[in-house]
Design a protein with these regions (language model features):
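Short cysteine/histidine-rich metal-coordination sites, predominantly Zn2+-binding motifs
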Residues: 112-122, 133-146
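N-terminal pre-ligand scaffold of iron-sulfur
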Residues: 36-113, 124-128, 144-159
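The N-terminal extracellular segments of secreted preproproteins, especially immediately downstream
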Residues: 5, 29-32, 42, 105, ...
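Bacterial Sec-dependent N-terminal signal peptides
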Residues: 9-15, 19-55
Length: 159
């Protein structure tokens, strides 16, 4: 009988520890789930189109990508084409449609040095290194990035 009485408090203590761990895990999960996760309904102007293309850097239209900070526009991919840039430490690719507009002819971005500029009246400007907004800090959406894999003289761009 003493043996059973001795085990009961020990099992109860184990159960309390397990319960505490369960509540701690649930607390961390609930704290990690938040409605404010830096997404904004206005950032849903661009459609999630399937992007899967490759660029041969030996071709003349893409050869300038072998040198840092010479962005290239690739038409007929993504929402408004794709802008690819060699940052010096790697390659980045962004959708060439302004993410702060409903897609239209004027919202296709043009390259101006290391900036992408919207053709609409507000002329939003974005960095072609980070994709961040440059001028109007009230804008919530950065450029839509794509995954770039460098394999020799070929870049594979996808989402």
């Amino acid at each position: 009988m003493n043996f059973i009485l001795f085990q009961m408090p020990y099992q109860s203590k184990k159960r309390k520890i397990k319960t505490f761990k369960l509540y701690a895990i649930l607390l961390f999960v609930c704290m990690g789930c938040s409605k404010d996760n830096n997404t904004d309904a206005n950032c849903n102007f661009l459609v999630n189109l399937n992007v899967s293309t490759s660029l041969n850097l030996n071709l003349s239209q893409y050869n300038q990508l072998t040198f840092p900070n010479n962005p290239v526009y690739v038409p007929n991919e993504g929402n408004g084409g794709i802008i690819v840039n060699n940052t010096g430490t790697g390659y980045v690719a962004f959708d060439a449609a302004d993410p702060n507009h409903i897609f239209s002819d004027c919202s296709v971005l043009s390259i101006n040095g290391l900036e992408a500029v919207c053709g609409c009246s507000d002329a939003n400007e974005y960095s072609l290194i980070t994709g961040q907004v440059l001028e109007n800090t009230a804008l919530r959406c950065m450029l839509k990035p794509y995954f770039v894999e460098n394999n020799g003289n070929t870049l594979y761009i996808s989402n």
